[in-house]
């Protein structure tokens, strides 16, 4: 276990969706001739309308781009290069059955992948999901409502008449573990969640806010606590549909009463480190555990933050 002070700790591991995998090769986005030159030998990631991909043996299954078309179609997005320099593109399309019956392929989305996916696969799938979700909802300009077309190998959209260019946007959100500097931390259950399902407090950053100010405001709004010593831990992209989760921890007072004024949180409680460790050992939200406390799955930064705090001595 990590021997750290009671008021500070760091993440013990990098969240799955934050790890460096494929080379994003961003310089090729503005050189379509070079990007297209790699198409005949490129790999293709199909993402269906439910944001699912085919996975087998811990890796995403990639097809041959040339089987889709003889050149990149306008709706394809360039994800980068994998080992050996092979280009990878993604499209929104139905998943194709695997011809080999010995390959145990299954259709899963990012939420269901957890620890079964390697770093490169997780980066490819998360980038593809984020980009394709954006294209699905950005066919008209936010500036004037005019139709737009994909550009930069799928990394922007352009008004073909005016030349106005728009890029994928993200919505920054904070997620925070509130603890007492000793042996207890706050976990909360949203009103929409089943009984026993708890996680960290989170919320979107408002205009004019820093991340730290957002942490203090969100926790005050959601459970009525005043926090201090807000400290950064790490970040993770979360393409559901386009969030960037920025993780923190902060000190709170267990003697301060909870209040749930905005209706988003149904209940919150202080849990001891031993209670949290037991819940982590029992599994996660998807398990059949009878534990009184069910925690987020391994793909989320929430899980990594909770695990890191629980490992403190």
UniProtKB/Swiss-Prot annotation:
Family annotation (InterPro entries): NAD-cap_RNA_hydrolase_NudC (IPR050241), NADH_PPase-like_N (IPR015375), NudC-like_C (IPR049734), NUDIX_hydrolase-like_dom_sf (IPR015797), NUDIX_hydrolase_CS (IPR020084), NUDIX_hydrolase_dom (IPR000086), RNA_Hydrolase_NudC (IPR022925), Znr_NADH_PPase (IPR015376)
Keyword Secreted: no
Cofactor requirements of the protein: Mg(2+); Mn(2+)
Molecular function GO terms recorded: magnesium ion binding; manganese ion binding; NAD+ diphosphatase activity; NADH pyrophosphatase activity; RNA NAD-cap (NMN-forming) hydrolase activity
Catalyzed reactions: a 5'-end NAD(+)-phospho-ribonucleoside in mRNA + H2O = a 5'-end phospho-adenosine-phospho-ribonucleoside in mRNA + beta-nicotinamide D-ribonucleotide + 2 H(+); NAD(+) + H2O = beta-nicotinamide D-ribonucleotide + AMP + 2 H(+); NADH + H2O = reduced beta-nicotinamide D-ribonucleotide + AMP + 2 H(+)
EC number: 3.6.1.-, 3.6.1.22
GO CC terms, sorted: cytosol
GO BP field: NAD catabolic process; NADH metabolic process; NADP catabolic process
Binding-site positions, a divalent metal cation 3: 218, 222, 264
Pfam families membership: NUDIX (PF00293), NUDIX-like (PF09296), Zn_ribbon_NUD (PF09297)
Co-factor binding comment: Divalent metal cations. Mg(2+) or Mn(2+).
Annotated binding of substrate, by residue: 111, 236-243
Subunit structure: Homodimer.
NCBIfam families given in the database record: PRK00241.1
Family that this chain belongs to: Belongs to the Nudix hydrolase family. NudC subfamily.
UniProt name for this protein: NAD-capped RNA hydrolase NudC
Organism (species): Mycobacterium tuberculosis (strain ATCC 25177 / H37Ra)
């Amino acid at each position: 276990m990590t021997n750290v002070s009671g008021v500070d700790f760091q993440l013990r591991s990098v969240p799955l969706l934050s790890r460096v995998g494929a080379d994003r090769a961003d310089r090729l986005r503005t050189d379509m001739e070079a990007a297209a030159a790699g198409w005949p030998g490129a790999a293709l990631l199909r993402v269906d309308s439910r944001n699912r991909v085919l996975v087998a043996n811990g890796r995403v299954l990639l097809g041959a781009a040339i089987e889709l078309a003889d050149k990149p179609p306008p709706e394809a997005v360039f994800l980068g290069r994998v080992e050996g320099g092979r280009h990878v593109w993604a499209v929104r399309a139905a998943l194709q059955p695997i011809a080999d019956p010995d390959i145990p392929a299954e259709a899963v989305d990012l939420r269901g992948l957890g620890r079964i996916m390697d770093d490169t696969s997780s980066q490819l799938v998360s980038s593809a999901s984020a980009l394709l979700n954006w294209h699905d909802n950005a066919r008209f300009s936010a500036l004037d409502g005019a139709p737009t077309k994909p550009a930069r190998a799928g990394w922007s959209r352009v008004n073909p008449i005016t030349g106005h260019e728009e890029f994928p946007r993200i919505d920054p959100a904070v997620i925070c573990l509130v603890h007492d500097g000793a042996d207890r931390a706050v976990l909360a259950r949203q009103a929409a969640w089943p009984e026993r399902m708890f996680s960290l407090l989170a919320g979107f950053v408002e205009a004019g806010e820093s991340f730290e100010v957002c942490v203090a405001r969100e926790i005050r709004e959601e459970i009525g606590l005043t926090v201090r010593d807000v400290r950064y831990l790490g970040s993770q992209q979360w393409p559901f549909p386009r969030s960037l989760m920025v993780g923190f921890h902060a000190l709170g007072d267990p003697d301060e009463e909870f209040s749930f004024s905005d209706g988003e949180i149904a209940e919150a409680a202080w849990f001891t480190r031993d209670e949290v460790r037991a819940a982590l050992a029992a599994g996660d939200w998807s398990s059949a555990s009878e534990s009184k406390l069910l925690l987020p799955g391994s793909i989320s930064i929430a899980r990594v933050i909770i695990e890191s705090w629980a490992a403190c001595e």
